[in-house]
């Protein structure tokens, strides 16, 4: 999402904020019923509880990408997630389908840490250092422009659900990979595949330089210096506190956490894995969960027979995900009902052409 898109969006009328929860729920329910199969609402796990009940599908990034690619019926897809997810949905759906984002301010700080101009500046420098030995791999939490560059250069997208499989494949294609924008997912995945930390370098996009003290020939993974502002806040101290105060508690974290945190946790995995593992656990088990607060709260509600806490007791929700709320959802649905275009996400054909190559490689491998 760029600044112009944010400025150009319509501002939601204030009367939506003045409506009661009961009124909004009734209106959303009514419009959903009227639109029927012409409307599809995918919803990410990190969304607010007030939005989730209206979802036609709930999932992680991989699940929602797969669902978007399979859905050919709905004319309108109202994406309850963040901007890069809506872009992905637009590229994977038909040209007749319209993807909208209820609030255009719902971006992703991690995705914004990898700018296409920074990437096009980095690539020739890396080619000079390593020659034609690098395959770019981008986390799905990236802009369409980044995905397009990666697709054009033979690379693929990846999610936290399929990271091990995709990165393993990528390392079979070229001698080394360039993983962006999340250094932690890249580091944790590569380490799980047996690559030592000393064989991983950092690419600093601000300085436009490689940060690596070893022999270049030993470098197998180049990590873009980006991170998730939510998962960065889970710390080793959080884990030590759980071990001290709740010795029977099992710790499961998202692989966007730092390597130190992931290494000390009992398990790590995508939001889908976290949800599935806890839901399937025996009654009475105890869990500390290192991921976004909305999801942790929902897991607690859905598992009253278990003791579940956030790994970080002072954790906040993802603030950009939180911009999608019931008033914005209703505002968007009423626009669709009235035949108005609002907050449509449309990726240009040239960008889509190569971004689809990266997305389709991932979906085929998944």
From Swiss-Prot:
Keywords assigned by UniProt, alphabetized: 4Fe-4S, Cytoplasm, Iron, Iron-sulfur, Metal-binding, Pyridine nucleotide biosynthesis, Transferase
Cell location: Cytoplasm
GO biological process, one term: 'de novo' NAD biosynthetic process from L-aspartate
Annotated [4Fe-4S] cluster binding sites: 108, 228, 318
UniProt cross-references to Pfam families, sorted A to Z: NadA (PF02445)
Taxonomic lineage from the root: Bacteria, Bacillati, Bacillota, Bacilli, Bacillales
Cofactor binding, note field: Binds 1 [4Fe-4S] cluster per subunit.
Protein name: Quinolinate synthase
Organism of this sequence: Listeria monocytogenes serovar 1/2a (strain ATCC BAA-679 / EGD-e)
Catalytic activity, as annotated: iminosuccinate + dihydroxyacetone phosphate = quinolinate + phosphate + 2 H2O + H(+)
Gene Ontology molecular functions: 4 iron, 4 sulfur cluster binding; metal ion binding; quinolinate synthetase A activity
S-S pairs: none
E.C. no: 2.5.1.72
The protein's enzyme class: transferase
Assigned protein family: Belongs to the quinolinate synthase family. Type 3 subfamily.
SUPFAM superfamilies: NadA-like
């Amino acid at each position: 999402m760029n600044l112009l898109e944010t400025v150009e969006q319509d501002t939601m009328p204030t009367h939506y904020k003045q409506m009661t929860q009961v009124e909004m729920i009734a209106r959303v329910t009514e419009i959903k019923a009227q639109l029927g199969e012409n409307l599809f609402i995918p919803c990410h796990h990190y969304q607010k509880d007030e939005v989730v009940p209206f979802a036609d599908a709930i999932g992680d990034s991989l699940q929602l990408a797969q669902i978007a690619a399979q859905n050919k019926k709905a004319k309108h897809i109202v994406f309850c997630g963040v901007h890069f997810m809506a872009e992905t949905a637009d590229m994977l759906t038909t040209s007749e389908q319209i993807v909208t984002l209820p609030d255009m301010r719902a971006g992703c700080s991690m995705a914004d840490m990898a700018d296409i101009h920074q990437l096009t500046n980095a690539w020739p420098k890396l080619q000079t250092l390593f020659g034609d030995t690098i395959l770019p791999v981008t986390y799905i939490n990236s802009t369409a422009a980044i995905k397009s560059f990666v697709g054009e250069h033979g690379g693929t997208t990846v999610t936290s659900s399929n990271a091990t499989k995709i990165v393993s494949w990528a390392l079979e294609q070229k001698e080394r990979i360039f993983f962006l924008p999340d250094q932690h997912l890249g580091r944790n995945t590569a380490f799980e595949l047996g690559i030592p930390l000393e064989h991983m370098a950092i690419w600093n996009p601000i300085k436009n330089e490689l940060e690596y003290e070893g022999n270049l020939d030993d470098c197998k993974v180049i990590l873009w210096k980006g991170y998730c502002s939510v998962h960065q806040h889970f710390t080793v101290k959080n884990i030590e506190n759980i071990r001290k105060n709740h010795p029977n508690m099992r710790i499961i974290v998202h692989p966007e956490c730092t390597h130190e945190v992931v290494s000390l946790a009992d398990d790590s995995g995508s939001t889908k894995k976290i949800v599935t593992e806890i839901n399937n656990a025996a009654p009475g088990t105890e869990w500390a969960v290192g991921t976004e607060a909305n999801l942790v709260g929902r897991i607690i509600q859905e598992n009253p027979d278990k003791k579940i806490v956030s790994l970080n007791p002072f954790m906040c929700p993802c603030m950009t995900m939180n911009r999608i709320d019931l008033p914005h959802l209703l505002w968007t649905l009423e626009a669709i009902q009235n035949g108005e275009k609002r907050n449509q996400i449309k990726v240009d054909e040239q960008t889509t052409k190569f971004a689809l190559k990266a997305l389709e490689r991932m979906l085929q491998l998944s």
